[in-house]
């Protein structure tokens, strides 16, 4: 079997006047993430991991932040389009593991919703999708609450490989 592993990363600045959307879940908080789309840092990291595993570049290659078509885009729609593109290239997703690093707000109450959204968008059973939440122990820009970061790993199998 032809296994492929991809790694994804994203970070966005926290600002006032934007909703905070992570893993497709709108989280009550006084600030949200700045970005061209909805700035869903977790879904962007997962999308990058998937494109990377399939050697199809990255999220910016497919959904440019300079393209007006993606202004305010729902990252769940972008993730589903990513899945369609990697499936068309002959890959199937085996699992995704991810980590969100945020000093605040507390993300644990929202993890189940994030996992459910991601599993649905990837067409995977829930037990093949993991989301972890960590703080940065008050260190650096993440620890000061200036932004939120996400990392992801994905395993794909090339069909017929």
Swiss-Prot record:
It comes from Burkholderia lata (strain ATCC 17760 / DSM 23089 / LMG 22485 / NCIMB 9086 / R18194 / 383). Its EC number is 4.6.1.12. CDD domains: MECDP_synthase. The record marks 36, 135 as: Transition state stabilizer. A divalent metal cation binds at residues 10, 12, 44. Its cofactor is a divalent metal cation. Involved in the biosynthesis of isopentenyl diphosphate (IPP) and dimethylallyl diphosphate (DMAPP), two major building blocks of isoprenoid compounds. Catalyzes the conversion of 4-diphosphocytidyl-2-C-methyl-D-erythritol 2-phosphate (CDP-ME2P) to 2-C-methyl-D-erythritol 2,4-cyclodiphosphate (ME-CPP) with a corresponding release of cytidine 5-monophosphate (CMP). The keyword Thylakoid does not apply. It comes from the Bacteria. HAMAP family: IspF (MF_00107). This is 2-C-methyl-D-erythritol 2,4-cyclodiphosphate synthase. The gene is ispF. Belongs to the IspF family.
